[in-house]
């Protein structure tokens, strides 16, 4: 079966409801916590480490929920939301490759913030480069990621880790 190489917003919302590829597919967050508007390209081949990649985008506008509360008089997108978006994309990649279960962020080796996302920005771009994919009893992905705002790199994350779990009771 040939897998789809890009996804629009309505498909990502369907993923959050368990309707994209069924309930076993790892779901994305819904509503305000979905930090992705579209997946531009996803591939299990190529990339910087030869293990695959995913490129995605988020459109920025001054009405996004976080600008009203982070911070009053000094609106900026919380850096943790950009980091979470990268974890969301690693989990989505694992499901897209056939992994099943509930996605959980397992950590990150290093994160550097060198810029910010303001309400005047237009577009955030996510660049995720898979380094390792384990598809056994434990499904896990390790990736490096970058966040760019209007083409300028502002966050870099090394060794983003996401696992898929069929049972999260004792997680």
Curated annotation (Swiss-Prot):
One of its GO terms (molecular function) is (3R)-hydroxyacyl-[acyl-carrier-protein] dehydratase activity. Its main location: cytoplasm. Pfam families: FabA (PF07977). It comes from the Bacteria. It is found in: Cytoplasm. GO terms for cellular component: cytoplasm. The active site is at 70. Its EC number is 4.2.1.59, 5.3.3.14. Pathway: Lipid metabolism; fatty acid biosynthesis. This is 3-hydroxydecanoyl-[acyl-carrier-protein] dehydratase. It comes from Photobacterium profundum (strain SS9). The gene is fabA.
